[in-house]
């Protein structure tokens, strides 16, 4: 991973025998690091143990989220008839991120498409939202709202072999393919976890309240 901090590029190599590898105190368990949210004026290499951490107000809502909310609402309400209105808003987000427009990307897909069903557009919007708003505190709520929490969370966490010292070991290279490995077991044992229980204190206050199913 390369971080641009205070005008300098910092290369964070994650193999075991490297400074940011598993042997260090704060190493990544997956071999991945998150650049999003790191202020470019921060400096992890400045003298002293703590470095320089620049704090700033966390954006609770962004224009991109409003575009995504609008796109999702249009698709659910109007279906395919709304897609000519939805795509320009998704393209605004893509343009800002420096990636090709939606239809241009799909024209180069393995199975190219120029139009989508309501269900297909829903999947596209879900994916665009997951990518654009990643690490901003939305994902947990989105998968519950869409009722796909078990589908998304009932699977193991995969990453690179952080014990590997060579490139081949780290990326678990087999032939010409890198093979991520399981780094953590994760399961979603029951659908009840998609919803919060009502506090017993609140139920005691009002006996007419009915506890959430499963709790």
Task: Show where each model-derived region lies.
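Acidic/polar-rich alpha-helix caps and helix-coil junctions
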Residues: 1-215
